[in-house]
From Swiss-Prot:
Pfam families assigned to the protein according to its UniProt record, in alphabetical order: Ribosomal_S2
Source species, domain of life: Eukaryota
Record key words, sorted: Chloroplast, Plastid, Ribonucleoprotein, Ribosomal protein
Name of this protein: Small ribosomal subunit protein uS2c
GO molecular function: structural constituent of ribosome
InterPro entries in UniProt: Ribosomal_uS2, Ribosomal_uS2_bac/mit/plastid, Ribosomal_uS2_CS, Ribosomal_uS2_flav_dom_sf
Gene source species: Phaseolus vulgaris
Amino acid sequence: MTKRYWNIILEEMMEAGVHFGHGTRKWNPKMSPYISANRKGIHITNLIRTARFLSESCDLVFHAASGGKQFLIVGTKKKAADSVARAAIRARCHYVNKKWLGGMLTNWYTTKTRLQKFRDLRMQQKTGRFDCFPKKDAAILKRHLAQLETYLGGIKYMKGLPDIVIIIDQQEEYTALRECITLEIPTICLIDTNSDPDLADISIPANDDAIASIRFILNKLVFAICEGRSRSIRNS
């Protein structure tokens, strides 16, 4: 796989607070190689390592996107949710940013059935079919549709399992990560100093609590995906 230059600048990472980890009491000893210092009880991530693994991740998603692969971005905590949705929409990726429903990938048949129900209800609403039902029944259908939109809206166009899953915050999205491991779906995971770097295929050590840090990482990955898609279009 050819390496490319992704303009990952250390000063910009510092401005985004990418280097700030968790308190020294909340850490995983496996993260020791990725920590450069202890500042006032806070672990500081080695940004050289961060840049290296972020660059590797960008190379991976670029080549995958140029080959027409499908991506799923997962980040459900409040600080990540909006950034995940914007990044995914920009790169035409699927996303989950509200709640990970257990078995979303490992029980794909059930998820596919829910998605079909979601699409059917959306079509009924668009064509005015809800107006044909009694008010009480229509209200129930609208609530059900709203619930499906909340939890499945980001994957409504997903026809099968994703080729690569990008996860924001390993601790928060552990269930999603385990499902990917079970199904052998490649993962890129943003990990803080309290995480296990051995679980994902590529782990990017970075601050997973600051919005600016999350956006910085996502922006680089999304740019690489968009570049890969553009290359695919040019070569077709």
